[in-house]
Amino acid sequence: MANDQEMSGWTDLLHSSTKLLEQAAPSSQFPPLQRNLDQLEALSRKLKAKTLRNEAPSQSIAATRLLAREGINADQLSRDLKSFELKTTFEDVFPAETTSVEEYLQQVHEMAMVSAIQEAQKDNVRSFNNYMLKVLEEDCIKEKRDFLHSLSKTSMLPKTKMINSSRGSHAGSLVPLSPQVSSKPGTELVSMTNKPIHEKKAYVYAEVVKKLNSARERGLPFKLATLFNGAYESLEIDLTRGKSVNMQKLWQLIQGMTGEESAVQHGVSKRMALVIGARRHLECGHGKHIMDTIQSHPTQAALGGSVGNLQRIRAFLRIRLRDYGSLDFDSVDARRQPPVDTTWQQIYFCLRTGYYEEAREIAQSSRSSQQQFAPLLTEWITTGGTVAAQTAATASEECEKLLRMGDRFGQTTYDKKKLLLYTIISGSRRQIDRIMRDFSTLFNTIEDFLWFKLSCVRDVAGGSSSMIVNDGLVPYSLDDLQAYLNKFEPSYYTKNGKDPLVYPYVLLLSIQLLPAIMHMSNEAGDEGYNIDAVHVAISLVDHSILSEGSGTGRKLSVMDANAEASSMIRQYGSMYLHHGDLQMTLEYYAQAAIAVGGGQQAWSGRSNVDQQRQRNLMLKQLLTEILSQEDGIHFLLGARGSGEEGELGRFLPDIKLRQQFLIEAAHQFQEAGLYDKSIELQKRVGAFSSALETINKCLSEAICSLVRGRPDGESRTEGLVLSGNDILNSYKYHPDVSAQERHLVMEQETILRELEAILSIHKLARLNKHLDAIREVAKLPFLHLDPRQPDTTSDEFQKASSYFQTCVPDLLKVALTCLDNVADTDGSIRGMRSKIAGFLASNTQRNWPRDLYEKIARSF
């Protein structure tokens, strides 16, 4: 019905429109326009918009009027509202969509937890970024310091002044001392208070090295590691903050390994003796730990007036086992409460502390150990750990029983210390590996771990093959220990560099001596560990043990290991040479030579032939290096003689060997062009003819240089002539000169005078004394240029020395120049020209300068 009415309305509207269109007459003023319905609608909307723009609603006008009355700018308010931002409310974030308070609170809780987690993540990221930035800055600073240190390695030693270096005097120490400072050690250390650590170390170590060389020269005993340790202690360096190992601990270890603190056990190999020494060092350290623990807990220790070793162990156990109840050695009435059996604890800690006799007494007195374990322990103590194969097998079987008991009834059914003790006596690699796998928490410190391993080590090279074949046991060797320790990077031991000496300490304990030294030498820093490394090498080489500890994978020979140490010591000594301290250079160079010679044995000549040869070769090479320095000859040889008054006599006491060395050094200097030093050495050993020959060679070259215009040629020639005359003077008063030497000296003196005559001719020519120069030329032998004398054959000129012959071409040029400047009154000038021409014609094979032949041709 409604649709019919709507359609009728549209129909009426269309009819009315048609009538209007028919009534409208066309106008000439306005052209007819055709529009469809869509166009009409668009035009109508546009027209309506124009009318609405100019018509403000009454509400808008009223609002503007109200704002104006209150003093508010409507336009400014509109602009502000455009930039206004609505903030979300709590209800917006947590819409109340839940139907109960509990659900709503649960939703709020979850959202709060999510927000907290997100904030924590942001804090973690920010903290991580800050930490990484700090680490990068520290690494950058460290790399910069290491780079600067590598650029100025020689600055590790301060500059020194040369001091009178006569034998027995103190020449140029690392720290220059003023004349007012006393030479007592106490006052010297006072003057070094403000010096850097590396300078202090270098000074006190150098004093020990000087004393070492002096003692070894005289064949006196010398505890080198002990004195190095004492020198380090005297510095009172406090570098132990946050560090478990310092240099003093390393020196104490070396004392123990070298046997300076206790007698070395006989009947074992040198390598096994080092193992025992390292183990004794750990035992001594544990003894100090026990005393510190007792002093920290005096009430619980209840030591009283007892000072025996066993009483100390029991006092320590009272503290350690205080939570276990009454201990057997303190129990009064065992029937009331069964005490804790500490037999195995006492034995273990007695051995751990080095109280072997007390450990044996406990084992023999206890019912749980006296029958089976006591004999095994006695043999282990007596043999130094090298028990018989049957003993090792028995101990290994007991280990198997204990392990099976633990698997069946639980590991708490027996004392773990009992298992460790039987494993130590067995020395079985299989048992040790199982303990490392199943009971890795038994060892509280790395010292405890290494002591256990060192106690298990057997001297495999000393006859372990029979043990393996007969009983099927594979003994634990030092190589096994080294291979296990080397699985971990150095940073694992040093805590990423925070405790830098732990790694070399572990290497030394595992008898990896050379790797320990090399690692320390590469430690650049203010602590001066590279200086310590050099002196550790000196100590180990002196005891002839460095080659025993090349480390796993570095099977070096004795010479290779000692050569590594020698190179390090030599490089360190060259730093003193760089600063002009010849005295300390000599001391360290002597140690470098001794290193390749086998250490202490090289001083007494007890090392093998090859080592002695290597030692002599290096010593001569290093002494030659010192001789080449300024004042080196005076330092080694003294004011006169061939070394009796200088330092050379200390290391080459035999006069024949000393003279032979100096002659060889002079020959090397001559080949290197160091003629002054070569002449001085030849003069010192009485080789006057050789010295004169060197002077004649240099004088011949100097004359040629003088003719060619060298500015210092004249002073050079005068100095050589004076040196030659000085040698001839010394020769006259020398007591022991052979007939052959006298003949050779006379020959060289003749050559010197001939060269001196040639030199005088050049001087006369420069002074324009041409006639005098010509007369001197006519007097020269071998040339026979005097026109009044008969001609000679060319063979006579061959008899002249090579030094004389070298000067002849320049001499003939000067002679021709002089002839051109002198009037020929009697034909003698022309006669001399003819003589010169004939002389040149007979020596055309010598390839003399072309301008000489041209000059003689022009003169005719």
Swiss-Prot record:
Tell me the organism's taxonomic lineage: Eukaryota, Viridiplantae, Streptophyta, Embryophyta, Tracheophyta
**UniProt entry keywords in alphabetical sequence:** mRNA transport, Nuclear pore complex, Nucleus, Protein transport, Translocation, Transport
- Quote the protein name from its UniProt record: Nuclear pore complex protein NUP93B
GO MF annotations in UniProt? structural constituent of nuclear pore
Q: Organism, per UniProt? A: Arabidopsis thaliana
The UniProt entry's coiled-coil ranges are: none
Question: Which Pfam families is this protein grouped with?
Answer: Nic96
Q: Name one GO cellular component term.
A: nuclear envelope
The main place the protein resides is: nucleus
Annotated gene? NUP93B
Q: What family name appears in the similarity comment?
A: Belongs to the nucleoporin interacting component (NIC) family.
Give the superkingdom in one word: Eukaryota
Any idea where this protein resides? Nucleus envelope; Nucleus, Nuclear pore complex
Which GO biological-process labels does this protein carry? mRNA transport; protein transport
InterPro entries annotated for this entry?
Answer: Nucleoporin_int_Nup93/Nic96
Quaternary structure, per UniProt, is: Part of the nuclear pore complex (NPC). The NPC has an eight-fold symmetrical structure comprising a central transport channel and two rings, the cytoplasmic and nuclear rings, to which eight filaments are attached. The cytoplasmic filaments have loose ends, while the nuclear filaments are joined in a distal ring, forming a nuclear basket. NPCs are highly dynamic in configuration and composition, and can be devided in 3 subcomplexes, the NUP62 subcomplex, the NUP107-160 subcomplex and the NUP93 subcomplex, containing approximately 30 different nucleoporin proteins.
